[in-house]
Curated annotation (Swiss-Prot):
Identification of the protein by name: Thiamine-monophosphate kinase
Positions annotated to bind Mg(2+) 1: 46-47, 122
Note: Reaction mechanism of ThiL seems to utilize a direct, inline transfer of the gamma-phosphate of ATP to TMP rather than a phosphorylated enzyme intermediate.
Binding residue positions for ATP: 121-122, 146, 214
Highest classification ranks of the organism: Bacteria, Pseudomonadati, Pseudomonadota, Gammaproteobacteria, Enterobacterales
Family affiliation: Belongs to the thiamine-monophosphate kinase family.
Native organism: Salmonella typhimurium (strain LT2 / SGSC1412 / ATCC 700720)
Disulfide bond residue pairs: none
Keyword Metal-binding annotated: yes
Binding annotation for Mg(2+) 4: 30, 45, 75
CDD domains: ThiL
Positions annotated to bind substrate: 54, 263, 319
Keywords per UniProt: ATP-binding, Kinase, Magnesium, Metal-binding, Nucleotide-binding, Thiamine biosynthesis, Transferase
Length: 325
């Protein structure tokens, strides 16, 4: 039997579940009605994902749903927010019920993990794409921003940037990885990145600035540099790289992916000298390595790199949707 828009929503997206107490009205009315907790600042982010641009057209729908939500959660993580609500506008070329079942099951599994609620959205026919609006909140005055870095602050990254680009290369057969465990790890880092929600929350009163690594370290740290109005010096020898990647590529390729590969969804953040001890206490037990890779400076402009103490330059840039090929 054909599945119309409203029956599609009812069957796959209006799940019976324990509702959040801050949702007065969710799916089923003209608007969602939300009650914002007292002394909290609302945090909102929106992302559009298009088949063939942001994800491979033949991607497993469960992986697609996970990644679509995870990359939005990463935006909340970068500002230290608590996740709360999601809207989803989904454009489909046709109603494929097995696809929708796998997609919605995966989406709700991650929503439930973070105690989030889908509160509304839209469905329409067309080339496969989706727009997610994610909402959360942050204690007033404690949000992490890109603009707070000061000269002398230390620059850190979580995890091992470059893994996602390596995983994409494996999926596209541009990188041959003979070890199954390494291939699986790299592919999962691309398809199912882990949003660093707990790290962002722990950094609220410790970091001076933060951003998530969506377009590559060169591009994203560059945003902190520009917004904060001071330069940055990065030691490329300090950049962390996973063994799974390093076993299969040379140092040059690994460095390129670490700096400009994108889609790692790790956090890059700056910490004043006074807070470095507190940083170890705050996120040292969260199970994800974090590495100091450089320092903000008033003596230089823009983003600068050094290797063995000597300046080096790179022509690489981060991802840009509208860049000329």
């Amino acid at each position: 039997m054909a599945c119309g828009e409203f029956s599609l929503i009812a069957r796959y997206f209006d799940r019976v579940r324990s509702s959040r107490l801050d949702v007065e009205t969710g799916i089923g009315d003209d608007c969602a009605l939300l009650n914002i907790p007292e002394k909290q600042t609302l945090a909102i982010s929106t992302d559009t994902l298009v088949a063939g641009n942001h994800f491979l057209p033949d991607i497993d729908p469960a992986d697609l749903a996970y990644k679509a939500l995870a990359v939005n959660l990463s935006d909340l993580a970068a500002m230290g927010a608590d996740p709360a609500w999601l809207t989803l506008a989904l454009t489909l070329p046709e109603v494929d019920e097995p696809w929708l079942e796998a997609f919605s099951d995966s989406l709700f599994a991650l929503l439930n993990y973070y105690d989030m609620q889908l509160i509304g959205g839209d469905t329409t026919r067309g080339p496969l794409s989706m727009t997610l609006g994610i909402h959360g909140y942050i204690p007033a005055g404690r949000a992490l921003k890109r603009s707070g870095a000061k000269p002398g602050d230390w620059i850190y990254v979580t995890g091992t940037p470059g893994d996602s680009a390596a995983g994409l290369a494996v999926l596209q057969n541009r990188l041959q990885v003979s070890e199954e465990t390494d291939a699986h790890y790299l592919i999962q880092r691309h398809l199912r990145p882990t949003p660093r929600i707990l790290h962002g929350q722990a950094l609220r009163d410790i970091a001076s600035a933060a951003i998530d690594l969506s377009d590559g370290l060169i591009s994203d740290l560059g945003h902190i540099v520009k917004a904060s109005g001071c330069g940055a010096r990065v030691d490329v020898d300090a950049l962390p790289k996973s063994d799974a990647m390093m076993r299969h590529v040379d140092d040059g390729q690994a460095l390129r992916w670490a700096l400009s590969g994108g889609e790692d969804y790790e956090l890059c953040f700056t910490v004043p000298e006074l807070n470095r001890g507190a940083l170890d206490v705050a996120i040292g037990q969260l199970g994800v390595p974090f590495t100091c890779i450089g320092q903000m400076s008033a003596d230089i402009e823009g983003l600068n790199f050094v290797r063995d103490g000597m300046p080096v330059t790179f022509d690489w840039k981060g991802y840009d949707h509208f860049a000329t090929p």
